[in-house]
Regions:
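NAD(P)H dinucleotide-binding glycine-rich loop of Rossmann-like/cofactor-binding domains
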Residues: 89-167
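N-terminal glycine-rich cofactor-binding segment
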Residues: 3-21, 38-67, 82-83, 100-114
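Active-site/binding-pocket entry motifs
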Residues: 11, 35-37, 71, 87-88, ...
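Proline-glycine-enriched beta-turn/loop adjacent to the NAD(P) cofactor-binding site
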Residues: 34-35, 146
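Nucleotide donor/acceptor-binding cores
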Residues: 1, 79, 161-162
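Glycine-rich beta-strand-centered segment in the early N-terminal region that forms part
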Residues: 20-34, 47-93, 132-135
């Protein structure tokens, strides 16, 4: 499969890589679309201190499950999914209080582990969220960035009288 790989800062190549196989609890996603985020640019330029090289970037992606690992229902095959790139342990204190984004063992697809700028990606099944057929692909790829705005709005709880600056 072809993958966009940042070998080191400012060095991008398209590389042929082996087709990944899903492990226990994982699914393999045939990627249809991926969004480009500022953080992908930061990794390319070497401005993300958490990125490890070489790295397949891309944390905003959408596709279809084409293989499942042990322990994952075969009914997931063929599902259209958006991928939550934040992989958390589910057991540490932040996870136990509903804040998996600050997990003590946090792994982010496209930063710490290869992401979605590839033809296929293996991700935990719990991070692959079913997308109804009524949602077009071009909108489904935007689920991850939309969740950022939705989360901030949920925490800020703005009212009609509030003024917000979006940067």
């Amino acid at each position: 499969m072809k993958s966009v790989v940042i070998q080191q800062p400012n060095a991008l190549v398209i590389e042929e890589r082996p087709l990944p196989l899903p492990g226990a609890g994982d699914v393999r996603v045939k990627i249809k679309l991926a969004g480009i985020c500022g953080s992908d640019s930061h990794i390319y330029r070497g401005h993300n201190p958490f990125a490890k090289y070489p790295r397949v970037i891309g944390h905003e992606f959408f596709g279809e499950i084409d293989a499942v690992g042990e322990g994952v229902e075969s009914t997931r095959l063929g599902q259209r999914v958006s991928v939550d790139p934040v992989i958390s342990c589910g057991h540490c204190y932040p996870c136990s209080v509903g804040k998996p984004n600050v997990c003590t063992s946090l792994v982010v697809l496209g930063v710490h582990r290869d992401g979605g700028f590839s033809e296929y990606a293996v991700v935990p099944a719990k991070n692959a969220w079913h997308i109804p057929d009524a949602i077009p692909d071009k909108h489904a790829v935007m689920v991850e960035p939309f969740t950022i705005a939705a989360n901030v709005t949920g925490q800020a709880k703005p009212t009609e009288q509030d003024v917000a600056l979006i940067y």
